[in-house]
Structures are given as C-alpha cells and as structure tokens.
Amino acid sequence: MNDQTRQRLLNLEALVEAGFAPYPYRFPKTHSAEAILKAKRGAPPESEWPEEEVAVAGRLVALRRMGKVTFAHLLDETGRIQLYFQRDLTPKYELLKKLDVGDILGVRGHPFTTKTGEVTVKVLDWTPLVKSLHPLPDKWHGLRDKEVRYRQRYLDLIVNPEVREVFRRRSEIVRYIRRFFEAKGFLEVETPILQPTTGGAEARPFKTYHNALDHEFYLRISLELYLKRLLVGGYEKVFEIGRNFRNEGIDHNHNPEFTMLEAYWAYADYQDMAGLVEELLSGLVLHLFGSHEVPYQGRVLNFKPPFRRISFVEALKEKAGLPFDPLDLERLRLWADAHHPELSQVPNYKLLDKLFGIYVEPELQDPTFVFDFPLAISPLAKRHREKPGLVERWDLYAGGMELAPCYSELNDPLDQRERFLEQARRRKEGDEEAPEPDEDFLLALEYGMPPAAGLGLGIDRLAMLLTDQPSLRDVLLFPLLKPKKEAVEEGV
C-alpha cells in the first residue's frame, strides 16, 4: 500500500467517524450537470435562483480550497459542473478537507452564476458516496499511454471526455442501423453463439467443451448459416447484430472478438441489397454529420449516393499491371512468385484476395462497391448469371478497408455440397481455416431456401471510420489484450 492510498483510507475513516455512511446505497439525483448548464447557460453574471433546488452526483475531478470557500468540479455522464462550498452555508464544511479528487460525491443546492458568468451549484448539503483509494491520472497530461488506456478503460473514460464521446457515437450508430432495418420490415433475431460446427466464413475458430453434452463446440465465426435456416423456415427479412469470434491475429482493423450485422432478404439479389446499403449508410452519415462528408484520418470521405462501383477482376488487373486474366490462377502464381515471394506459401485460390489487398484496397477511400468476385474465394455466393468463373458478390470498401460483403446467396443444395466438399479437401491438405461441411445446413437447403441477398456489415470498422479512430481498439470498450505477466499487486 502506498502513502497516497494510506492517506485516503485515513480520510475515509474520518468521514465515517463524523457520521457519514462509508458507501451509502443510493442518492436521489434530480438533475444532470448538462441539464443545469443548459437551463442557465447565457444568464447574466451573478444571477441566482435560490428557489430552484437541484441534486447532482458525480466524481470530483478538481478541488480548490480557499479558506472560507471551496470550489470543485464534479463530473457526471453528461459533463462537468462547478460546485461552490461556503463555510457559513455548507454543513460540516471542515470535513471537506477529507475529500480527495476522484471521490464520488452527491450535493444539494441551487444554481447561480459567478462574476465571470460560469454556471455553478451553491452547495447547501453534501454526502460522500464513494472514496476513491487511488489518485486520478495527472490532469495536465491525462491518460495518453495506449496500453494503459485499453487495460484500464474506466480511467480512460474518466479523464478523456473525447473517449466517452466515441462510445456514445458508436451506440448511436448501432441504434440507427437497428431502427433502419426494423423500418424496412426486417425481423431482429438471435442465433447460437455456441455451434457444433464452423461455417459461414473461412477462419480458425475458438474451441470449447460442453461437459453435460460431452461434446466439443465452437464459438461462431459467422452468423450466416443459422440466419439462412430462418429463410428456409419462412421468414423473408431477418437481421442480427451479434458477436463473432475468430482465433486469428490482431491488428488495427482486426480483433478476435468483433460485432457484425448480418441481414438476409428473400426474393432480392445483391443489386437490391446494394441500393439498401447506399440508403442506410448515406442516411446514417447525414444523421451524424449533417452532410455526406466524413473526416477520417486526414481525409474527407464522401458518402453521397450513388457510391462508386468497380469490378474486382478489372481493378486488380489494372492496379497490379497484370498482362493476363487474373482468373488464370496458374499464371497468377508464376507472376506472384516473381513479384511477391513473401506470398509463396499462400494457396493459389487465396492469391486473388491477397493481391487485391495489396494493390487495390488501400486506394478505396470514398465508399466503393467492388462487384463480381472470383468463385474460388466465395463459397457461399451464387454463380454469376452472365460471367463464368465469377459470383454475384460485392464488397463495400471505405477508408481503405472492407466494411461489408454481400452475396446473391447460393441456394442450390447440390452446388453448395460440391463447394463444401472442396473446402473439406483443402482442410485435409492442411488449410485450418477451411470449415467442415455442415450437413444440417445442407439438409435445410434441400428443403428449399428462396432466392435471397445476404449482407454482413462490420460494426466495429464502421464505428472506427465514423468516429475518426485509427484502430479498432479505440472503438471497443474492452479490446482483447495479452494478459499482464507481472504478478498482481496485493490488494488494499
């Protein structure tokens, strides 16, 4: 225990001896800081409203004792407001010296404005609610060490108001998306997180074991296959906002635990879904920013519809300078071996995706639909109705990263079985990301799934883009981190 913690415990003891409950059960707040400031902002200096009693509570983030008067700043969820304590008005005034910055305090009083016009609460009664046993980070330098910010997000939220705003904005984004799909007649559903097989994407899963069922299960890597079962069951428009888990690497736009929206629309195709997504995102941006322009990492992205549309194959051929059709995987392998030896261990069918990420993806800053992907990298999409070797799939990019894939969904059970068997063959050859065939899903398809469009929208990446953050960790309240190796200090 350090000296500061020891002193704070002594201060707590003194408050208890004076008759205060150490950790009371409740405090009847009547106002937020924001509500008081909004009601009185702009009032002339030295105005006072003694008949308007307010009760506010929050954390002390500044404390300035000046003999017969004490000023403090109290922070609640909505912002901070100044408090004014006066010896001849405030009960137990001398005990204020037992308060520390970081304590949680409840006060009652009435609002007034100071000589400089600052809206302030004149405190007529006060109650310590929680004694903080540790000082807050330095007020001038705040909390800037990213590792500490991620591990102790609670401190980050206390001292960095802009961080609180990021997560409010994230919640607003999710709320808008949910209401949009509900207004379009989509039904929100929940599907299993624990699944007996993996499917819906190619990724390494997390495994777990269910003792009562004596069976190995996986944390889902995708929402897709269970939502498609609902189309078989008769629902025509469904969506889910939920967590997926992939046992893979971590970087600025990948996290093993992430949030996706998936939506499935029966009797529609990928062109229909493109129009819906344009409407969703352009409307969301207009709602948040008042225009279609989004500031992101030194650029301004324009979300005014219609979004740009390009071809996967043509864009890759042009940007990489390929003198042949990229769908010729044997020639593509020879070319990649000569120009990108670091990709020598990448299977041929994944080369297309890897090279697209190198040559095309970084240039896709304004929202862009990339249409018509190769069949080899799209095992769940319907074959293109006009272009052999391609599927009806688009991916939406913005800010140089993928935000959302969409398919005209494959609903031919025989074709789907063949593609699953190809994935199984690759799995036997050592591809750990290739899933095993999901026989129950194939059975569902054999009963008949209507033609449909399917969308997957990455909520974390979208939040990252619309809050101008450089990393997914900045839009995840508690991102996954390597456990600290240091021994846990003995608690107080």
Swiss-Prot record:
Residues annotated for Mg(2+) 1 binding in this entry: 395, 402
Report one GO cellular component: cytosol
Which subcellular locations apply to this protein? Answer: Cytoplasm
Write one Pfam family the protein is assigned to.
tRNA_anti-codon
Top-level taxon of the source organism: Bacteria
The residues forming the signal peptide are: none
Alphabetically, the GO molecular function entries are: ATP binding; lysine-tRNA ligase activity; magnesium ion binding; tRNA binding
Q: What Enzyme Commission number(s) appear in the record?
A: 6.1.1.6
Binding positions for Mg(2+) 2 per the UniProt entry? 402
Note how many cofactor molecules are bound and how: Binds 3 Mg(2+) ions per subunit.
The cofactor(s) it depends on are: Mg(2+)
A GO biological process of this protein is: lysyl-tRNA aminoacylation
Q: Which reaction does it catalyse?
A: tRNA(Lys) + L-lysine + ATP = L-lysyl-tRNA(Lys) + AMP + diphosphate
Record keywords, A-Z: Aminoacyl-tRNA synthetase, ATP-binding, Cytoplasm, Ligase, Magnesium, Metal-binding, Nucleotide-binding, Protein biosynthesis
Q: Family, per the entry?
A: Belongs to the class-II aminoacyl-tRNA synthetase family.
Quote the subunit structure annotation: Homodimer.
Q: What is this protein called?
A: Lysine--tRNA ligase
Lineage of the organism:
Bacteria, Thermotogati, Deinococcota, Deinococci, Thermales
Q: Which gene encodes it?
A: lysS
